[in-house]
């Protein structure tokens, strides 16, 4: 499969079919082709002998999708950067990626970036002035060339750029279309920001099958009235989100088959799917199939899936995350480096063509997490799990990396930035669970010198600093102040003791 060719055929076969909808803005497959062609032609003329990645900044604007395809047609991987990402983090991505160009689909609020920036208006001008120009198809990203690079949390305080090739994405997309029984021309929910790789689960299966992406932005999510008004008119048939987002929607009693009468498939990834959420969805949408999936960004979105039936719910207290896609395989590795038997816990290792080629510009980090097994790329996930007759069960993180509301983050990165704040002498992040999954982050802080009379004022000052360094979803919800942090005899932070103290 050549991904771009599959997407472009809809511009010929169904040119007026809507490819993407966001609020009052929409684009057809013909517009998507014409504008991405124009942009690719401009990029190739400006950067003729260059294949450095291109940053694409914005939120849910149609120009984001156009820019992604324009970059790839010109032979450049794209780096999606959501406008919610703090300026400091955007700067670090720009510096570490080697990008020379940033395309802005929204107003750019970050200044002093070491890259050339194309404003929202200038982007529109490029679409207009280069209209009708066809890029050289030989320039397009192909095979093992990078298609996109998504930055995830890094333990040193610096984000890591996960490189996903054309072949990685083709492997995922072909499997998703077949395994999830996706049909031509369906309407897909697009809820995850493009800088979160869950969005790939809807973008490319939709575009390859001539579907329509229906985007829900963060402002809608913050205003349930707007959210459900949009869902009502969407006619969504394929739902892609974290379980947390579906759980939030289930709090609205009208969120059911009556609101979305043609709902066919729920696709969940990014965090644990609780049994209760699956049960409620089955009650509200009796005709829909619920798919539970698993996979890290480093293995292209997801590599396992299972339909969650009543039998599965009745059989398992914690839902399994599924069977591996046919072109990949899973190994459960014990601490001694041997492969675990059925039912034995260990680290989940993913082997096959879905696996990333590594972290951009970080050979040491790549060597630590990626390897070759029997001539194929393999990724050591750091996730704990076990297999039973080919079925994978996920048991959380082996290290201090967690998933909170679908976002993966390393607690050490948050601690790194928290300790760098004024008024903070020492700090540890404690993730607090509610049932099976993480509910919020608690910051246990040893304060430095300060003149605040009340703890809440100190907390506000620390949060203000953190907001300049970290995305909102990585900011701890609660703060607790102590005179010291408990330590183990080895001189390490005693996290178990700390957790027992704060949850007692």
Swiss-Prot record:
Protein function: Catalyzes the first step in the D-alanylation of lipoteichoic acid (LTA), the activation of D-alanine and its transfer onto the D-alanyl carrier protein (Dcp) DltC. In an ATP-dependent two-step reaction, forms a high energy D-alanyl-AMP intermediate, followed by transfer of the D-alanyl residue as a thiol ester to the phosphopantheinyl prosthetic group of the Dcp. D-alanylation of LTA plays an important role in modulating the properties of the cell wall in Gram-positive bacteria, influencing the net charge of the cell wall.
InterPro entries for the chain: AA_adenyl_dom (IPR010071), AMP-bd_C (IPR025110), AMP-bd_C_sf (IPR045851), AMP-binding_CS (IPR020845), AMP-dep_synth/lig_dom (IPR000873), ANL_N_sf (IPR042099), DltA (IPR010072), DltA-like (IPR044507)
Reactions mediated catalytically: holo-[D-alanyl-carrier protein] + D-alanine + ATP = D-alanyl-[D-alanyl-carrier protein] + AMP + diphosphate
Binding site for D-alanine: 197, 301, 492
Matches recorded under Pfam families: AMP-binding, AMP-binding_C
Keyword match RNA-binding: no
Highest taxon of the lineage: Bacteria
A cellular component annotation (GO) from this entry: cytoplasm
Enzyme type, top EC level: ligase
The protein's name in its UniProt record: D-alanine--D-alanyl carrier protein ligase
GO biological process terms held by the UniProt record: lipoteichoic acid biosynthetic process
Family listed: Belongs to the ATP-dependent AMP-binding enzyme family. DltA subfamily.
Listed Gene3D superfamilies: 3.30.300.30, N-terminal domain of ligase-like
Protein residues bound to ATP: 152-153, 292-297, 383, 394-397, 492
Keywords, ordered alphabetically: ATP-binding, Cytoplasm, Ligase, Nucleotide-binding
A Gene Ontology molecular function term of the record: D-alanine [D-alanyl carrier protein] ligase activity
Pathway: Cell wall biogenesis; lipoteichoic acid biosynthesis
Record localization: Cytoplasm
Enzyme Commission (EC) number: 6.2.1.54
């Amino acid at each position: 499969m050549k991904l771009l060719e599959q997407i472009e055929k809809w511009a010929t076969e169904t040119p007026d079919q809507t490819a993407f909808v966001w609020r009052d803005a929409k684009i057809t497959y013909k517009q998507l082709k014409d504008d991405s062609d124009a942009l690719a032609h401009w990029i190739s003329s400006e950067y003729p002998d260059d294949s450095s990645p291109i940053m694409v900044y914005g939120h849910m604007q149609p120009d984001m999708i156009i820019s992604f395809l324009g970059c790839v047609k010109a032979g450049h991987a794209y780096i999606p950067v959501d406008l919610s990402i703090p300026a400091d983090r955007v700067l670090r991505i720009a510096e570490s990626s080697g990008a020379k160009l940033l395309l802005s689909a929204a107003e750019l609020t970050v200044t002093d970036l070491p890259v050339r920036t194309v404003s929202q208006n200038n982007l529109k001008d490029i679409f207009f002035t280069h209209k009708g120009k066809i890029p050289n198809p030989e320039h397009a990203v192909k095979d093992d060339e990078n298609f996109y690079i998504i930055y995830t949390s890094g333990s040193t305080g610096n984000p890591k750029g996960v490189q996903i090739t054309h072949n990685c994405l083709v492997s995922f997309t072909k499997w998703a279309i077949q395994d999830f029984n996706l049909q031509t021309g369906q309407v897909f929910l697009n809820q995850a920001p493009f800088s979160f790789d869950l969005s790939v689960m809807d973008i490319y299966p939709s575009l390859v099958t001539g579907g329509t992406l229906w985007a829900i932005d963060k402002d809608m999510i913050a205003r349930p009235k707007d959210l459900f008004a949009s869902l009502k008119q969407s006619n969504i048939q394929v739902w892609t989100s974290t379980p947390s987002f579906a759980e939030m929607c289930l709090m609205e009693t009208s969120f059911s088959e009556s609101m979305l009468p043609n709902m066919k498939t729920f696709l969940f990834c990014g965090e644990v799917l609780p049994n209760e959420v699956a049960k409620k969805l089955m009650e509200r949408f009796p005709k829909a199939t619920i798919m539970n999936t698993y996979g890290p960004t480093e293995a292209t979105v997801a590599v396992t899936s299972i339909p969650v039936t009543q039998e599965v719910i009745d059989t398992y207290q914690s839902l399994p995350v599924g069977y591996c896609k046919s072109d990949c395989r899973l190994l459960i590795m014990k601490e001694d480096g041997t492969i675990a038997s059925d039912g034995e816990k260990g680290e989940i290792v993913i082997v096959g063509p879905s696996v990333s080629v590594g972290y951009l510009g970080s050979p040491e980090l790549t060597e630590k997490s990626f390897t070759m097994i029997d001539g194929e790329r393999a990724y050591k996930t750091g996730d704990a799990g076990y297999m039973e007759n080919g079925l994978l069960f996920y048991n959380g993180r082996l290290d201090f990396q967690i998933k909170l509301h679908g976002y993966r983050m390393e607690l050490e990165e948050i601690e790194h930035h928290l300790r760098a704040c004024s008024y903070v002498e020492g700090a540890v992040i404690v993730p607090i669970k509610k049932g099976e999954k993480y509910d919020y982050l608690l910051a246990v802080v040893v304060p430095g010198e300060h003149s605040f009379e009340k703890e809440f004022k100190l907390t506000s000052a620390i949060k203000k600093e953190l907001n300049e360094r970290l995305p909102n979803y990585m900011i701890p919800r609660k703060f607790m102040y102590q005179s010291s942090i408990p330590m183990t005899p080895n001189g390490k932070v005693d996290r178990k003791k700390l957790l027992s103290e704060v949850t007692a």
